[in-house]
A protein has these predicted regions:
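Right-handed parallel beta-helix
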Residues: 89, 101-106, 120, 125
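Surface-exposed acidic, glycine/proline-enriched linker/cap segments
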Residues: 112-134
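Conserved SAM-binding loop
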Residues: 64, 105-112
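Domain-scale signature associated with acetyltransferase and cell-envelope carbohydrate enzymes
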Residues: 1-102, 129-136
């Protein structure tokens, strides 16, 4: 690939930042937004694109987790959110602009098992639902 002078400088800075902040990773391209880092298990040789978001919001201080396997490649603008458990297996490639999550703000089907699942109720007022997710 031909990165050009500025591309090579940016790549070098990303590599240095990776080795300082994410020692087991292959290359983290900055900026990256990480929330709940203590609940994230990074595998070895992780590669990310730019502008990724990795977030963990545990339920009532229980240990929610985002587990990323070995040799995973996550492209630009990927958003992964976990409340209970999201696991990315080994050797997984995730395309750009992908959203992976184990949480949702209700459903919109004819089975109205929850009273707050109607589209006219704002998402922040609906119950959160979580179910474990595995990609791999």
């Amino acid at each position: 690939m031909n990165y050009g002078v500025l591309g090579v400088i940016r790549l070098a800075l990303d590599f240095i930042g990776t080795k300082i902040a994410f020692r087991k990773s292959r290359l983290i391209r900055f900026p990256i937004d990480i929330r709940g880092r203590s609940f994230i298990d990074f595998g070895s040789n992780l590669t990310t694109g730019r502008y990724c978001r990795l977030e963990v919001y545990p339920i009532e201080h229980k240990k929610g987790i985002l587990k990323i396997g070995d040799n995973v490649e996550i492209n630009d603008f990927v958003h992964i959110a976990a409340r209970l458990s999201v696991q990315i297996g080994n050797n997984v490639l995730i395309a750009s602009k992908v959203f992976i999550s184990d949480i949702q703000h209700g459903c919109y089907n004819s089975n109205k098992m929850f009273n707050d699942c109607y589209p006219d109720i704002p998402p922040k007022e609906r119950s959160l639902f979580a179910e474990s997710v595995f990609v791999g």
